[in-house]
Regions:
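Core catalytic lobe of class I
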Residues: 1-138
Length: 138
C-alpha cells in the first residue's frame, strides 16, 4: 500500500516541502476574489492574479510532467459587469508554462435566486484543467 501524507498549513509554505515533479494530481479551490473576507482576509480582483501566481509557480514545479492540475474558480460581478480576473489568470499561467487543456462546468443544482433585479445567480462554477505537457494523465 502507498504511503499518504497530509500537509496542513499555508499552501505556499507546504508546497516548498514537496520534491520537483512528485505529484500526479492537484485539485484546489482557492478563495475567490473578494469572497470570504472574514475567513481568508479576502483578495481583491485587482490583486488576485498577483496573489495566485506564486502558488501556481510552485504547483507547476511539483506536478509530474504527465500530471494534471484542476482549478475551481469563479468570476465576480463588480459594478454591473463580470470581472476578467479569471481570464487574466489563465493568460498569466500560460506565460508561466502551463497549458490550459480543458474546462469543465460544475452545475450547482442547489443554487437559489439572487437578490438582483436584473441578473440571474450563476448555477455553475469553472473547473479549469492545466497540464505541463500535451501528453498527460487524468
Amino acid at each position: 500500500m502507498s504511503k499518504i501524507t497530509i500537509y496542513q498549513g499555508d499552501c505556499l509554505q507546504k508546497l516548498k516541502l514537496l520534491e520537483d515533479n512528485s505529484v500526479d494530481l492537484i485539485v484546489t479551490s482557492p478563495p475567490y476574489a473578494d469572497q470570504r473576507k472574514s475567513t481568508y482576509g479576502g483578495v481583491s480582483t485587482k490583486e488576485y492574479v498577483k496573489w495566485f501566481l506564486p502558488i501556481s509557480k510552485e504547483l507547476l514545479r511539483v506536478l509530474k510532467p504527465t500530471g494534471t492540475f484542476i482549478l475551481n474558480i469563479k468570476e465576480k460581478v463588480q459594478n454591473g459587469e463580470r470581472s476578467t480576473y479569471v481570464l487574466e489568470l489563465i493568460l498569466e499561467m500560460r506565460k508561466q508554462g502551463w497549458l490550459w487543456t480543458e474546462e469543465f462546468i460544475w452545475h450547482k443544482k442547489n443554487s437559489y435566486p439572487g437578490k438582483w433585479p436584473n441578473r440571474f445567480r450563476d448555477a455553475w462554477e469553472r473547473l479549469l484543467q492545466f497540464n505541463k505537457n500535451k501528453k498527460f494523465n487524468m
